[in-house]
Amino acid sequence: MARKLTEKVSWIGKIDWELKRFHGDEYSTHRGSTYNAYLIRDKKTVLVDTVWLPFDHEFVNNLKREIDLKEIDAIVMQHNEVDHSGALPALMQEIPDTPIYCTANGVKILKGHYHQDWNFVPVKTGDTLDLGESKLTFIEAPMLH
């Protein structure tokens, strides 16, 4: 279920109350964690990130309750590890031609995880995506979690 954050932005992620350890034993998440994904609605509609693979179908079904998937003009993948990109294969089965904006390294990571040659649009720092009344400006930030 989406949570409206602003007039144009909704959180469409997943709360995982069962996650107790993150990245092995490195971090304790004894209160669970979230997989954050956002839906931005302007003249163009953009999905930012997805959720972890075990929640892929739940994520896609929740997204379908919020929007006709064909109305998604673009997907922005800013974090490409499977805890944020895991639902991408299930989503791309529904909307296979939707452009995926991410860095060149992001393209390599996503291809490495999922072995798919989706409609990738590589971006670099300073590139923008015009949404209508607003725009996204890309910043390469490797290793940022």
Predicted regions located by residue number:
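Generic structural signal for beta-strand residues in well-ordered domains
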Residues: A2-R3, H30, Q93, L129
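Metallo-beta-lactamase
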Residues: R3-E7, C102-H145
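Conserved beta-strand hairpin/beta-sheet module of binuclear metal-dependent hydrolase folds
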Residues: R3-R65
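Active-site environment of divalent metal-dependent phosphoester hydrolases
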Residues: L19, N80-S85, V107-L110, H145
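Short catalytic-loop micro-motif centered on adjacent basic/acidic residues
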Residues: V46-D49, A74-M77, T137-F138
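Active-site metal-binding motif and surrounding structural segment of the metallo-beta-lactamase
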Residues: P54-I100
